[in-house]
């Protein structure tokens, strides 16, 4: 029987690349998204993961469809950029629910299946912002730091059952989420969009380039496979030298 994976935020960007790569590697994939792509990789599953029950149902759906669940990739994300005094509380709550509470509920619901796998893998797509901060991103930075703490805890809890838990921490990736940040950053910093990309988005990168989604998917595939068994409780950085500063 093939291994099975659940990938959130799977209709575009990093999640789509991860779902495609894991499927190419022979896994059955439940591709979870608020607006799933029926023509995309994996089996599409619609879910609003800001709700606790939707996360639990997604795990149950994967188990019902595939009969097992070996890999969770918690990738779904959203961003909001604003100074703290202008940051809407409702956006804080939405971001934290999707970026931090959703991975927690997925892990909680899937834990028995990951244990039964014998080599369960929990992989969160965190960010360089799980290790360092930038202004105007209070909710995102707080949630991503929380995800790094979550995988460290899961790694310790899962060690005796062969479960690993890691957080992939990329810099800026060429995704719709990053592209949507450019006008927000331009407004927040009173810059043109072109200058916002050069001076803000890529400023932390020692290598001045965006990361490709397929590159992140390659790291996820490694962590999900047998060669990744020594990695657990780790923030796995791939940030173009951002956190080397």
How would you label these PLM feature ranges?
Residues 73, 159, 164, 231-233:
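Short, small/polar-rich loop/turn modules that mediate ligand/substrate recognition or access, typified
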Residues 83-84, 91-96, 201:
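Substrate-binding pocket helix/loop in short-chain dehydrogenase/reductase
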Residues 85, 132-139, 160-161, 208, ...:
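Active-site loop immediately N-terminal to the catalytic Tyr-X3-Lys motif
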Residues 107, 143, 151:
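Active-site helix of classical SDR
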Residues 112, 156-157, 229:
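Alpha-helical segment proximal to the catalytic Tyr-Lys
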Residues 127:
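Residue(s) in the substrate-gating loop at a strand-loop-helix junction
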Residues 132, 220-221, 232-245:
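Short C-terminal tail/terminal secondary-structure segment
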């Amino acid at each position: 029987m093939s291994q099975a994976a659940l990938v959130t935020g799977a209709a575009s960007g990093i999640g789509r690349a991860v779902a495609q790569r894991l499927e190419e590697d022979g896994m059955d994939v439940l591709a979870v998204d608020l607006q799933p792509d029926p023509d995309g990789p994996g089996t599409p599953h619609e879910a609003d993961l800001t709700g606790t029950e939707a996360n639990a149902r997604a795990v149950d759906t994967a188990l019902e469809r595939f009969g097992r669940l070996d890999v969770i990739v918690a990738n779904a994300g959203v961003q909001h950029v604003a100074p703290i005094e202008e940051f809407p509380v409702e956006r804080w709550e939405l971001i934290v629910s999707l970026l931090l509470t959703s991975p927690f509920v997925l892990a909680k619901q899937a834990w028995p299946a990951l244990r039964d796998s014998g080599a369960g893998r929990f992989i969160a797509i965190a960010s360089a912002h799980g290790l360092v901060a930038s202004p105007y991103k209070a909710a995102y930075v707080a949630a991503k730091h929380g995800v790094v703490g979550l995988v460290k805890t899961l790694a310790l809890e899962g060690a005796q059952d062969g479960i690993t838990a890691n957080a992939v921490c990329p810099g800026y990736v060429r995704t719709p989420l990053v592209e949507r940040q450019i006008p927000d950053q331009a407004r927040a910093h009173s810059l043109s969009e072109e200058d916002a990309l050069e001076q803000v988005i890529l400023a932390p990168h020692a290598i001045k380039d965006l990361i490709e989604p397929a590159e992140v998917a390659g790291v996820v595939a490694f962590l999900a496979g047998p060669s990744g068994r020594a990695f657990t409780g780790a923030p796995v950085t791939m940030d173009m030298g951002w956190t080397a500063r």
